[in-house]
Each structure stands twice: as structure tokens, then as C-alpha cells.
């Protein structure tokens, strides 16, 4: 431990103690808050089913930075490189298209065995796994509909895919001793004015009920559903809207997924957390950064990321909120993207844990909004960076931008040699 770091740490402890904050307790709590990293940043959502196929479903990864992972071994190696440079507990979020098989597997036939390598890798790296059915980039999703499709056979295919995905998710939870959160997102919608908005939603409701009909151990598997405002090619109508899934999660008591980029640009999910928690048992968050639309830019340590973290901490939602990331930027080093976004999420959580929330609540209850605003702003100047640096030190990860040197070395030695 360097003398400079130790001195900064001791001063920070004193400064935070003066406002009633135990920084050691804040770090202990941070160690109980895993962030689920998304595998698809590493290969631009290509997956291993058909890596050369085009990405569909109204989503888009832009850029062509060299070094993209081309197979599971490369993706796992890249993830390990990123995770070494991110302090504290982590999980990995997988999509169904990241299965491994020597022969083609239809999506409605995926099985736990196709993800055995991921489970063994997660065990070796002390990670939990989360999961997602992949209802996009497939011939049977080409017309823009999956679980709400008017064709019974196509709709059944996607129902069976989601059913099979739930069994994979339960396998993750059983093997790893921590529940897998399986999130259902579908791209279903229409480009232009839609006359019958009801029938697709009726079909989706019935399809989802069939998907979750098999009872699974909640210690192994958690169902979540995710809404979206629009996608490319589905600008006018999205079957799985916010109102649809809020109603579904409430009535079926599933988890609700709130994605930072899936609402109108003037809406923020930080304001939705406390409202949704009144009605649903658990929330899954997809922390992202929408720029004018659901662009999935790398997460920053900005006001909204901080507000999301603060909502979790202020309302003691540690056991009810699952924190996941969802961005994919192909214009920069993909490993750096993981590191920047995940470290920023963890920094936001730490800053929230260092807030004198009890004192702020008292001021708010007393109607002293002047003092509330003053303390909130002064809090921003307290030396949280010194606490972060100590946290990184304890987890044997670089505290500042030194991590970039490791990424550059890995890029030179490994990424640059990929075709």
C-alpha cells in the first residue's frame, strides 16, 4: 500500500465520519452488490449460432474496431481480461445464441448441456450467470414478430424457445448456487400505423403464460420481462410496451426489467424504480446510455447512472433489485468498454453508499429543502475517490486509468492477431 494512498484513505475516513458515514461499512456493502456484465459487448451481439448473420430486432451495434471475439474461447478470455480490471463481485449475462455445440441446434431445442462450458468457467471464476432467450436474428423473427406472431406454429416455436431457456437458466442457478435472472425481451412491433393493437397483445399475454407455466425453484431461476418504446423498423407500435409488461409483472408477480434506453428520451428509469417496487417483487435493471434513441452507448458516471444507484441504496433494495448492464459499442476497444461501463456502475453505487441519507431524510421531512440541497451538493465534493482507490487496492485492481495499460498490452498481444 502506498503512503500517498494510505494518507488519502485516512483523511477520507475522517471526512466521511464527520457526516456520519462509516466507509468500511460502505465497502462491505459494495462487496454484496454484484453487477451483471453482458457477454454481447464482446462480439457485437453476434453469438455462436450464426456469427456471420446480420443483427435484427430493431437493435444495432455500430463501429468496426478490430479484435472482436470470434468464438467462445476468445470471448471468455476477453471477459477474464476485463474482469481482472474491475473490482468487486460480478456476474455474467448470457444470451441463448452463445450456446456451444458441434452441430446446429434449433433454438427451441437448446439444453443445459449446450452451456456446460459456461457453467464450468463461471465456477472457476466464482461468478453467477444470468440468461436471456434470443428472440431476434433468426428466420422466424424476420417479419418482426415472435411471441405475438399470428401464425400459431411460429408463435409456438418462440414459446418453446423461451421454455427451453428457462430450463437452462434454472440449470445455471442450481449449479452455481445463486439464482439466474432470465429476462424476456422481444422485438415484436410494426413500422407504420397499426390498426389492431389489441390482438398481438392478447397473443403475447397467452404466450407468456404458457412460457412460465412450468414451476421452477425460485432459488435457481427468476423470470423477468422487459418493455421497449420502439426499435428500428418498429417505430409506430411495440407489442411489449411499458404498460403491458408492468401489468404482466404485477399480475403474475414476475420481475420487471427496466432498461435505461427503452423509454422516451425525456424519461428516466431512476424515477420508475420506487413506483414499480410497490407492485412487483423484484426488478432487473439494464443500465445503459441512450443518445437520442436506444443507442446503447457505454455507461458513464453521469447523473442518471448516479440516480439509479442512489435509488437502490436509499430504499435498501439490495435484495430486490438485480443490476445488469446493456450496451454494445463496436467503435472502441470492446474490453475497455466493459471496464469503463462496469467500473462506472460500481463507482455510482459506492457514491450512493457514502451518502448521509438518514440526515437528508430528516431535513426533507422537516421541510428544510435549503439544507437538503446544500448537503446534496456538498456531498459531491467529499473525497469518495480515495475510498474507491482503497477498494480497488483491496481487490488487486488498478485504481485509476492504469488499467488502460493492461488493455493496450492485451490488444497488442492478442486482439491484433485476430482476423
UniProtKB/Swiss-Prot annotation:
Q: Which UniProt keywords apply?
A: Cytoplasm, Isomerase, Manganese, Metal-binding, Rhamnose metabolism
Manganese keyword on record: yes
Q: Where in the cell is it found?
A: Cytoplasm
- Cofactor detail note: Binds 1 Mn(2+) ion per subunit.
Q: Which reaction does it catalyse?
A: L-rhamnopyranose = L-rhamnulose
Record bears the keyword Hydrolase: no
Cofactor(s) needed by this chain: Mn(2+)
Output a single Gene Ontology CC term carried by this record.
cytoplasm
Q: Which GO terms describe its molecular function?
A: L-rhamnose isomerase activity; manganese ion binding
Q: Which GO terms describe its biological process?
A: L-lyxose metabolic process; rhamnose catabolic process
InterPro entries in alphabetical order: L-rhamnose_isomerase (IPR050337), Rhamnose_isomerase (IPR009308), Xyl_isomerase-like_sf (IPR036237)
Q: Which cysteines are joined by disulfide bonds?
A: none
Q: For this protein, what is the EC number?
A: 5.3.1.14
- Annotated pathway: Carbohydrate degradation; L-rhamnose degradation; glycerone phosphate from L-rhamnose: step 1/3
Where do the annotations place Mn(2+) binding?
Answer: 262, 294, 296
The record's listing under Pfam families reads:
RhaA
Function, please? Catalyzes the interconversion of L-rhamnose and L-rhamnulose.
What the record says about family reads: Belongs to the rhamnose isomerase family.
Subunit structure, interactors included: Homotetramer.
Q: Please identify the protein, giving its name as recorded.
A: L-rhamnose isomerase
Q: Which organism is it from?
A: Escherichia coli O157:H7
The gene it comes from is: rhaA
